[in-house]
Amino acid sequence: MSRSIHKGPFIDVSLLTRIEALNTSGKKEVIKTWSRASTIIPDMIGHTIAVYNGKQHFPVFVSDQMVGHKLGEFVPTRTFRTHVKGDRKARR
């Protein structure tokens, strides 16, 4: 179920304050965050946000196409590992 419109998008308070502080100062810094559930808003465009995937922080450069999506959508948490080709032959 989607979020109610009258509540507005979810954005972590500490992330929002850091974005607003960078917008007023005009600096460009990488912002570390663990909040994968935060929605990308237009104020974040042009900033690089390092999103945690459970192991390390991955930098995500926010563009205008990303507005409305969640930060966690752009950083995968699982890596797909295929079986070694030699293992397939050994099983035959």
From Swiss-Prot:
Main location class: plastid
Coiled coil: none
Keyword set includes Calcium: no
GO function terms (MF aspect): rRNA binding; structural constituent of ribosome
A GO cellular-component term linked to this record: chloroplast
Compartments (UniProt record): Plastid, Chloroplast
Alphabetically ordered keywords of this record: Chloroplast, Plastid, Ribonucleoprotein, Ribosomal protein, RNA-binding, rRNA-binding
Entries under PROSITE patterns matching the protein: RIBOSOMAL_S19 (PS00323)
UniProt-listed InterPro entries: Ribosomal_uS19, Ribosomal_uS19_bac-type, Ribosomal_uS19_CS, Ribosomal_uS19_SF
One annotated GO biological process: translation
Any one Pfam family match given in the protein's UniProt record, by short name: Ribosomal_S19
Family: Belongs to the universal ribosomal protein uS19 family.
Known function: Protein S19 forms a complex with S13 that binds strongly to the 16S ribosomal RNA.
Protein known as: Small ribosomal subunit protein uS19c
Source organism per UniProt: Porphyra purpurea
Lineage of the organism: Eukaryota, Rhodophyta, Bangiophyceae, Bangiales, Bangiaceae
Gene that specifies this protein: rps19
